[in-house]
Amino acid sequence: MKTTTGLIRRIDELGRVVIPKEIRRSMRLKDGEEVEISLGSEELILKKYSRVSSLKSLCDNCANSLSKVLGAEVFITDTSKVVSSFKNIENENKNLTHRFIEFLQKRERAINKGEDCLSMFIGQEKGKEQLILPLVVNGDLYGSIVVQADEIKTQHEKATQTALYILVGQLEN
């Protein structure tokens, strides 16, 4: 049943509520994904939850530091959107492209050059080279760190790997 304020659903005997497929699709909710449940006055609020987004200030600091040290554009993502972007703050909260999400699902690191660089979101300016490191904790994918520069060098990989270890350490706790 649909009302002017939303949908009406029954709670089953186990306390479950079905979220319609259209809503799951538009919010990019996948099977097994976490949602945050909060209570208001006479309301129950479901909110998409991202462990990476919950570490926003740490992600901002990591992206800022990496960008300054490497002189490159740095993005930190969760599995559906950009969480931190130092050089272009307007890129934050942009949805990731399906192609980029599919690549992340492989849980592989990559260095892409030229035309092989993946667009993370619609309208993104591609760098000449791109380093992608997935954020994986206990086998679960939580996001990625992406560095775009004119040339990816060993120092880019090592510094980004260090930032990755810091974020993974926080996500494990």
Where are the language model's segments positioned?
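A short beta-strand signature within small-molecule sensing/ligand-binding domains used
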Residues: E125-P134
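Juxtadomain coupling helices with adjacent low-complexity linkers
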Residues: K56, D60-S65, V146-N173
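A generic structural motif
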Residues: R24, I89-E90, Q148
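Intrinsically disordered, low-complexity terminal regulatory regions
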Residues: I8-S84
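Short, solvent-exposed cationic patches
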Residues: S41-E42, E102-D116, A163-E172
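Structured interaction and signal-relay segments at domain junctions
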Residues: A63-I122
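A detector for short, charged/polar N-terminal pre-domain segments
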Residues: M1-I8
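Short hydrophobic/glycine-rich mini-motifs in sensory/regulatory modules
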Residues: L135-I145
